[in-house]
Each structure stands twice: as structure tokens, then as C-alpha cells.
Swiss-Prot record:
Protein family according to the UniProt entry: Belongs to the nonaspanin (TM9SF) (TC 9.A.2) family.
Biological process terms in GO annotation: intracellular copper ion homeostasis; invasive growth in response to glucose limitation; monoatomic ion transport; protein localization to membrane; pseudohyphal growth; vacuolar transport
Cytoplasmic side: 329-383, 432-447, 501-532, 587-601, 650-672
InterPro entries registered for this protein in UniProt: EMP70 (IPR004240)
Disulfide bonds: none
High-level lineage: Eukaryota, Fungi, Dikarya, Ascomycota, Saccharomycotina
Protein name as catalogued: Transmembrane 9 superfamily member 2
Membrane topology, record value: Multi-pass membrane protein
Organism the protein comes from: Saccharomyces cerevisiae (strain ATCC 204508 / S288c) (Baker's yeast)
Amino acid sequence: MKRGVWLLIYCYATLTKGFSLPGLSPTTYHSGDEIPLLVNRLTPSIYFQHQDEEGNDVSGDKEHFLYSYDYYNKRFHFCRPEHVEKQPESLGSVIFGDRIYNSPFQLNMLEEKECVALCKSTIPGKDAKFINTLIKSGFFQNWLVDGLPAARKAYDSRTKTNYYGTGFELGFTDVKQTVDGKAVPSTMEELTSEASNEDVILDARLPKNVKPNLVKTVELPYFVNHFDIEVEFHDRGNDNYRVVGVIVNPVSIERSSPGACSTTGKPLILDEDKDNEVYFTYSVKFVASDTVWATRWDKYLHIYDPQIQWFSLINFSVIVILLSSVVMHSLLRALKSDLARYNELNLDNEFHEDSGWKLGHGDVFRTPSKSMLLSILVGSGMQLFLMVMCSIFFAAVGLVSPVSRGSLPTVMFVLYALFGFVGSYASMGVYKFFRGPYWKANMILTPILLPGAIFLLIVIMNFFLLFAHSSGVIPARSLFFIILLWFLVSVPLSFAGSIVAHKQCNWDEHPTKTNQIARQIPYQPWYLRTAQATLIAGIFSFGSIAVELYFIYSSLWFNKIFYMFGFLLFSFLLLTLTTSLVTILITYYSLCLENWLWQWRSFIIGGLGCSIYTFIHSILFTKFKLGGVITVVLYLGYSLIISALCCVVTGAIGFFSSMFFIRKIYSAIKVE
């Protein structure tokens, strides 16, 4: 058994890294060829804690925003090219907030530059306050050179590895501490001019005679206005070069004229009470590298906390294997005993009294309340399940690569539309299983109800993004394209699936007949009641994806590259297996206690518990301070959407597992 476990782990370990598709051809440059530098949106970075000189955490007033800003937003006053041109992007890239434009930076292969003046910009005090707020919140700039993100070199002390962290700072913060009771200067100019006054600004290592409760933290935001660009290239000979890495070292320098370019000067602090003249400059350096084009992404794709992921997956895999072994052994033994007892014909007795789960044979296939809604949710859940499974699989084997921006969400949209056939087939099949009379209503509502509700919520979130002037606003053209894809592809396929299921699906052929009068359900133990069973079952389902959710949220909210799809695929398979086993087990023991109302219970127990824990996890993920009402609404709104979709997917898994289990066991008994 141990060999099987380790073999399974090894197989999935080979899927933990994606690879580039051969069809993505590299760009070869010659000496002097222009290398386009593109600018993308400004994004929030993952939470970090300020530290003093002794390495101790220092609390600050850092707030975090969960929406991005357009690079050429008027409040930033960045240098613009003569003609700003928006670059073509995929549907997924646009929906996830990418806004890529050309830039005034001039990069030519092997032509190094030193302190080139870019432009002079005047930043009003009102915009300076906005920029300072984003600097304190840890916003990053995102550039692209030859398809590679501009990065900063970073070191992971936990794995003791060097890697390239995508993006670089909009600015830096310097943490100072002030003694309460002393007047803190109201302007940045006064603050820096009095920096030598020890009564006002103290070193991070405070004297022992200063009481801690009198100390306050002040963050000084330094705005970046100089960029040291380092382009790594691979020499292929015969004056052929390929870009294999881009490093940007941002510098904050206060200048009074564009000619001065020392990096050792005073940092630039934007005054929030007056206009600020800012000179933007950049330098370019080319560095030869042995890295070949095919492996240039390896430096960017860094696994954070791999030991935690391996430990959690191995630990939970062992738990699932033990759980499945116990469940299958106990369940199969009990069923074998039950079936042998139920199918015995005692010729000496005129009457034979049923007991256990066989008592529900006349009610277990009874039509539940709101059968239309349940069938639609189950069918939509199956459609989402197949979309998620195939998307993760394609990414794990390398068919979807970070080389192509927005490719994964685009693939997910297309797969969801294509799987409309399967989703509607499942929905109509379940509705026939319930023997519902309004099959045409089911055919119409299945491709509209859940997608329409999600689309409406996204549009509402879009208005909040629009109010915040975020680059994450989905353009009307993209929304129209989604609707077009929906009605021209998904809806026709859904109608076809419903019609095929209505004519060919035989799920309405039940192994037992339904009694005219429903059997009364006796008192149930507390652990089998719906609410308690839901929370208990949800622990097992959520445990299989808890660790991966952290990395997914980090990628979703803080622009981190997520590529550990092998881990994610393994976790999703564990989620599917765990949800199925636990739901079947609870359904079986409920039937043994004559509770034949399994339809809604299997969906709720399989889905609601996991979604509740997922939503709680998303709330606990926000250890940081959310900046503003809009950020809170957006975070809660999108977390609610993710949790609801999780509920539908796992609920469908639980329902279908219970449905096929019940059909199997009741078709194996003889009912007189």
C-alpha cells in the first residue's frame, strides 16, 4: 500500500511544473534592434510587515487595496509616449484587469544607456496624497519586455533559493518613530527638515527611558523616479540574441534639474500640500546569460512554502486513503449483509417485515420539493466541475502556460461554454429522475439561471471598480463578447444536451415503485441532522484544498504567478473523492434510520459545508487592513461568488454520488 501511495505522489509531482508550448516561437534580436518595453497596470502586493533594525515587527498604518490602476491614470503623472497605443489582449487577460500599453522607454539590443532623461512631470498635492497612499499600501509597477515581466531579484530564506519576483515597487517606505506629546510636522518638507531633531524623530532603537505607549510610528513614502533596467540576453552567435530576463532596480532621488543623476542623494518625498516637480530618468544595462530561451521562465516560477504543500497533501492523502478504506470496507460489508438478508425468502413465514434502509424503497425515489431548482443546480455544478477539472489538467500538463497572458481564464470561459451540453444533459436527466413535468422550463432555465446570477453579481462588482477608477473594470465590449459567447455557443449546446437527455436518458426508470402515502421519518440522532452533518462533512472536503486556497488567493488578489497546477490537480481529486465518500456514508446511515429525504440533503451536505469553510478561510486570509469600503465590498463580493461556485460544484458531486449509490443498492433487492 505504501508503494502505491508514493507512486501516486511521484506521478503528480511530475505535473507540478508546466512547460512552454513548442508553437510559441521566440523573438531573435540583432545589435541595435528595438526591444519594446510595455507597461501594465499597477497592482497591490502581498502583505508584509515592517521591521526595525533588530528585525522586530513594527506596526504601521498600512492599508491594502484589492484593485489595480491603469498605468496611465492621470493621477500618477507618469511619462507618456507621443502616441499611447493599447496592446491587443485576450479575453481572459482583459477580464482579470490587464491593461497593456506602449511606453516612452527606448531599449535597443546591446546599447547601454546611463541616466537618460525621460520627462519632467508636475504632481499636484492632491495627487501626491493619492500616490503616497498607494506607496504605503505596497503597490507595484508591472512592465513587460519581450513577454517577460520586469522583476526584482529576491531570496527565499525558507527554501534558500534565489528567484525573480514579478513587478517592482511604486515607492518605498521608511519607518520612523515619534514620541507622543511632541508635535509631528504637518508637511513632508517640515518632517524631513527636522529629521535631525532627536526630540521629534527617533531611531528605531528607542532609549530605555522612553515609555512604549508614548511611541508612534510614522511612515515616510519615497516615490520612485529612476529605473535601472538590466536586460539579460542569450547569445546564439552570428549577431543573434534573445531576451531571457529583465531586472528593474527602482530608485528614489530628489532632483532640482534633469542633469543630476546620483543614486546616493536624498530620496524623493512628494509634498501633499503643494505641487511637486519630478524628473524621471532611466539607465539600461545588458548582461550576457547562459539561460536559454526555453527555460527563461524557470527563474520567475517560484514555489512558496513547498514543504507545507507537500506535507499537507501527503498528510491528507493518507487520511483520505484510510477514510476510503474504512468507509468502503464497512459499507460493502454492511451492504452485503443487508442484501443477503433482504433477498432471503423465508417460505415458513407468511409475512416478512422489512427493516433498515429497505423500508424506504417506496419513498426514496419520491419527487423532492423544488425539484426544478435542484436539477438546475446539479446540472450547473456538473458543468463547472468539468470546466475546472479540464482547466487544471491542461495547465498541469503544460497546455496552458504563463507565457501567454490570460490564457487560463480564456480557456476556462471556452470550456464552460462547450460543457453546456453536458451540464444541461445532467440537469434534464436529474429532472427526469424526479419525473418533473415541465421539461421545457428546465431546458430554458439551466443555461440561464446560474450564469445569469453570476454575471449580474460581476456587473455589480464592476460598478464598484468603476467608481474606484480601477483598471479592473471589465469593458463593455468584453461584457458584450461574453454575452455573445454565452448565447451563440453555450445556450445552443445546452438546448441540444437537454433535448438529447429528454429523448434518450433513462434515469426516470426507478428500480422500485413509489408509495402513494409518504412514510413518516422517525427522530434522527444529532450528528445526522442536516446542519450538523453539513458542518462535519465540510471539514473533510475543505481540508483537501485549504492550503492551495491560500496560494490561489495570493495570485488572485496580489498578482502572483500561480503555476503549481500539479498540486492543485491532486487537491481537486482529493476534494472530489472525499466529498463523494462522506456524502455516500451519511446518506447510507440516514437511510438505515428511515430518513428517505436524501435529494436536497446530499446536495447541501456535499456542498454547503465546504463553501462555508471556504468563505471563512477567505475572511481569515485578510489579516491585513482593507483600505476603504469599496475594497471590503469587492473582497466580500468576490469571496461570496467563489464560495457559491464551490458549493454548486461539491454539491453536484455529493448529489450524483448519492443518486447512483441509491439506484445501485435498491436495484439489488427484491421488493414484493
